[in-house]
Amino acid sequence: MSNVRNVFSQLTDPSLKAVIQDEAYRVLKRELAQTRHTNPFAQSPEAADALEALGINSHPYAITSHTHAAAKAIESDLYEVVSHYLPKENPVSFLFMKPAKLRFFHRGPTHGDHFLNAHVEPKDVPRYPQETIINRLADIPTQIAFMGDTLHFLSPSFLTALFAHSPRLQTLYATLVLPPEPSTSRSLYPQIYTLTYSEDGFMYIPGGHAGASYFHKYDQLEWLTVGHLTAPGCPTVTAQRLETKGANHLFIFQRGNYITPERRTFATNDQYVTVPHIFLPENYNCRTPISKTTMMQMFFYIKSGKEAQREGHLGQVQQLISTKELQHYQPSEITLLVNYFEFTATLDSHTCFEDVPPKLAPKTTPAPPLGISRILQFFRGRPSFVKLIKALDWQPITLEFPVRDVRTTVRGPPGFKNPFTQPQPVNPEDADISSRFQDFSRATNSTPKPTVEAVLEASAESPDHHTQLKVLCSALSEGQLEAIHALGHSRCGGPLLPELTAKSTPVEQCPDLPPCPTKSQASPASSNPSGPDAQPTAQNPETLPWVAWLPKLNALGFEALEVQHDPSTGEMIMPITDTQELPRATLPAHWQGHNLERILSTLRSLNRFPTPWSPDRTRARAFTSDVKNSRTGKALHRESQTWKETQTMLTENTQTELAISVIHGAGGSGKSQALQTLLRQDHSLPIEVVLPTNELRLDWLKKLPHNPPEQFRTFERAFVSSHSPVVIFDDYGKLPQGYLEAFALTHANLELVILTGDPRQSTHHESNEEALISKLPPATTIYSAFSRYYINATLRNSKFLANKLGVYSANSCPLNVTYGFQPLPGLHLLVPSLMKKAAFTDAGHKVSSYAGCQGITAPKVQILLDNDTTMCTKEVLYTALSRAVDSIHFVNTNAQSSAFWEKLEATPYLKTFLSLVREDKITEFQAPADAPKPVTPPVTHFPVEEPATTLDDFKEELRDKFDREIFTSDRGHTNCVQTDDPTTQLFSHQQAKDEALLWEMIRARLKISTPEANIEEFRAKKDLGDILWVNYHRAMGLPKEQPDFSEDLWNRCAEEVQNTYLKKTMAQLKGGERRQSPDFHEHQILIFLKSQWVKKMEKLGAKEIKPGQTIASFQQHAVMLYGTMARYMRRFRDALSPNNIMINCEKTPQDLSRWVLNYWDFSKPSYANDFTAFDQSQDGAMLQFEILKAKYFNLPEWVIEGYLDIKLSPKIFLGTLSIMRLTGEGPTFDANTECNIAYTHTRFDIPEGTAQIYAGDDCAIAQVCPEKPSFALLKNRIALQAKPAYTPQERGQWAEFCGYLITPKGLIKDPLKLHASLELAKAQKKAGVRDAITNVVANYSLDAKLAYSLGDDLQDLLSPHQAHLHQVTVRDLVKFGGSPFLNSD
């Protein structure tokens, strides 16, 4: 290795070093990819070192956490080892294994493997899919089987019975998890697992995490030493260990009597020893195994010191034993160990024997008799040296055991107790599911089919007879299977468990290409077109040549049920052409992960599965050479010379094979639609998009506005900056020749290339004739061989235009072709040369060249015909002609010259559009005359009305003050009716100082409960919350995939909440000082009575005063935290909500008016609604709905738990409140609004697209919708009580929303409400309130302006009474100085 290192150190060329590093990185990348597959978790340094000693690599940049990551890595690694033993062609039976783990064995659905599982423990119910459950292992259908981490819990007789009753089974591979060191009282791999002991067994705790631990009995350790298993009359089974890593072992059990090693060792690199028993009694000797290294260090220490001291020995032991290992020792053991060293330190290290070899003994020294020395030792005792040698006779812990034979008894086939044979306790939350299960079971009693229990009992294991392997699923209805599955899931964790899967999942074969459509397959009617002008004809789908492709065409948006013909040739146009079968690419193992598998699934659904591709180094070298010598490109040649030389050397020396998927199709065929949908749904996918032009990049950004901009790069920037394993090259034909190959060879991280383009359109043209790439064939020619089929259909162009180009079209709009002699202003102009492009651009036109217009789509384009047109290729002309949707304007400066007709003859497409005859004169295009300008009607005004009678009807029904006030015996009357003025008495004045009203508000609005009762209610109504959430999810059009949590958006929302709070005045901030204190408990709430004038029309002049509204003052930190939560979800809601649903949040009346004009339907009666006691009615069902909504947006768990805690335990001075909404919470408005939406859509069957508007407890719908039949079963459990209002939507009767009327001209303020409010201000002014008018005139004038600005249109909107109120109000506002606001823009 040193020689190789020396050679590398002598290399000085940076380009050569870059190539070597690139090659090393390619090897490293493959190894890291494999590591990510088997060990994707973040490991501690100690655990990573321990795994590496076992031959398992750890990913250095992994961030995925796991409670027992190291143990999981060993488990996955043993699966990887097993995969090399399993056959690649034949199926294998997997026992006690989840199908999801099949990826660790490098196997998939195509292998047809069998999964045989049983519900033994409760956690097995959600773990194993229902279709894999059996209740006896009687006949394994394959020769080879695998059992994962289960055999150590079973008896040896299970194994012999398994082989005895499965004659086809020859080999069983099994992994066991049994630590071999229980006798040593400590874990050999504390970084991976720990052990605890009891009298009858021990606990195995992977990663020290108690949640993953399980219990072993000591007799289960016998599995580590089993060699042969025999039973009377049964074949012998031979066991042999294949691999051991820590506590995980891989065994093979083979039918037959084979030789197996007589001993097995489980020793590690670290040697452990125990000290001999030198003290009496024996239990006062140290028994703890200690590292031999530590013992040797301690021995040298005690023998190298001058004098033995107990304190010194104890301190040295403390230094040698690390802090982490101290937990494995008892103080008594340490004390005994120190005594041992203290004793051995006193013993003499010098030999006491005088015997020496004869050659070394002096001749004059007589040899003492050996027998005499032994006799003297017997009487005098052993010398100190002999005692020392005996004390140093440490006993090693070898972990080596003899292999033994095991004899078992004869038993029936392995089986498992049926969990349905005895009743099980059901939680209250399971009531609905249990009810469904019982209903399904009862439903089958009236049919010949047996019930669930009967079927399971019939298939239960019997000791003397065995009939079947699996439960007969045909005896169970789909509903029963679903009920069983749901019942099991609900008992083991709820909605996070996997869903019920189908009985069988069809396996899609790749390349999955339907038969190539041929013209000979057409019916006689479709194969004989009537001529060039034949119109498309409807066809029976079964007779279409492309019937096998209809699902794919439908997915792209084509019905494809009619036959279309090329008008120039009369031939049928096929929507799918150029089909070919291609081999499938073999992708790295880590592609079985979730994100990368989604990409493959998308390509598989398109029949575009990747195929192998080896980049052409000749084309790559041509491109990098041109870049190096500045012969091409605008930006790459500005890179450093060293970088350019490195790229050139990489293309010369690198060889690689990648996966490529080529998507070819006509313009507007939806080539990129599925890819854009994939990127839109998941922004985190490791995909980059490379575009040939910045215009195309901006187009992608416009279609995917929420994706990060750096995901889309132009081709030169991508060549320098790209690092993704998957790259999409859109419109790749416009990339320089050789670019794709150079990109693939210089980017070692690239694994999958996706190309989208159209070989029939123009390709990149290199204007520099000196460039090497100018001599290369177009990329579309090369990569057409990698395209499985061509989509010869378009959604863009008119059928009459597309058919002339030989393309199938789904757009039936008529084609409009016009001619002229000069360009029309405002239309996109296409010209054949760059010179003409520059000239017309300078003249003020929007211009593109024929070749440069690729990617542009416009309803109408104009095409310039000149002498350069004849030099354009058919691909360039096709590109230009296919830009228009349904209208083309040809521009020719000399239409009658012979050159013009030569142009038509020289090009293959133009003649199909220009139906001209030489002798006929071309009809010149004449623009239609401008429409006459509308005459502005004369300005009129409403007639002057007498204001004195506007509120007389309300005043006449007024009762006396004390007849209206609320009376209580302990606090007397409330004080809401004030002054003697009848106008003022119409409005209830609620004041915070009114103690009688405060207590009446508490009695009516608040309900005292306990935390336990709140929890019980929350649990009891969870099912209702689930229903509300499902309806809300559907109504708001939320995607199925949950959006990832955005830390950046959360921080911005928190800043907005904080800034809003800091905008308060100093007095307001000081007023909230108490709840800002850290001593103010987060559950504590201060309750106040809201001071207000009640101006609701239904309470105007009310006969009885109603209780006031509450104001709740929460801890300020909690308000800001959950205000941030509400604002965060609001941002997502605003981005995802459908256009027909408007939420009046951060919107102006003008915004609402624009929305009404676009979406509201006034042709039907409308529905509006308010609620009775809306806040108090939001009980446990609404709380569950809020929790599910927060979880959907992936809010941090601590935020959700904190919000739930506050809602369940809110405390006021009277005690704990029940679950309800309180004004003053952070998310009050958003939560009210969303609960309103959820309730409305749960109650009503609202057609899709119906206009709806919501704000808190107010809502309005553009039509009256029928109530869902299911709501009759729910309404008695939902506390909300609606107050619906129906209006016919005609003059004077419009839907009301938040004090506004929704009219065909937009929103206007309710004239009665506005007039009444102004009358109150006038009465207050009269009563002596100096600023009563001044404070409101601006706001009231702006409210009135909504109607005032409509002018005479109000005559069509307002009833006579409303018009009267409007005129009086405007007249008063003008008197009070409101004219500037009424006439403002």
Curated annotation (Swiss-Prot):
Regions of compositional bias (Polar residues) in chain numbering: 518-540
All copies of domain RdRp catalytic, residue ranges: 1164-1271
CDD domains according to UniProt: Alphaflexiviridae_RdRp (cd23246)
Positions of ATP binding: 665-672
Family assignment from sequence similarity: Belongs to the potexvirus/carlavirus RNA replication protein family.
Single annotated GO MF: ATP hydrolysis activity
Stretches for region Disordered: 504-540, 625-644
Role noted for this protein: RNA replication. The central part of this protein possibly functions as an ATP-binding helicase.
Domain (+)RNA virus helicase C-terminal: 792-925
Gene3D superfamilies, A to Z: P-loop containing nucleotide triphosphate hydrolases
Domain (+)RNA virus helicase ATP-binding: 635-791
Occurrences of domain Alphavirus-like MT (ranges): 59-224
InterPro entries reported for this sequence: (+)RNA_virus_helicase_core_dom, Alphavirus-like_MT_dom, DNA/RNA_pol_sf, P-loop_NTPase, RNA-dep_RNA_pol_alsuvir, RNA-dir_pol_PSvirus
Keywords: ATP-binding, Helicase, Hydrolase, Multifunctional enzyme, Nucleotide-binding, Nucleotidyltransferase, RNA-directed RNA polymerase, Transferase, Viral RNA replication
UniProt-recorded name of the protein: RNA replication protein
Pfam family, one: RdRP_2
Reaction catalysis annotation: RNA(n) + a ribonucleoside 5'-triphosphate = RNA(n+1) + diphosphate; ATP + H2O = ADP + phosphate + H(+)
Gene Ontology process terms (BP): DNA-templated transcription; mRNA modification; RNA processing; viral RNA genome replication
This enzyme's EC code(s): 2.7.7.48, 3.6.4.13
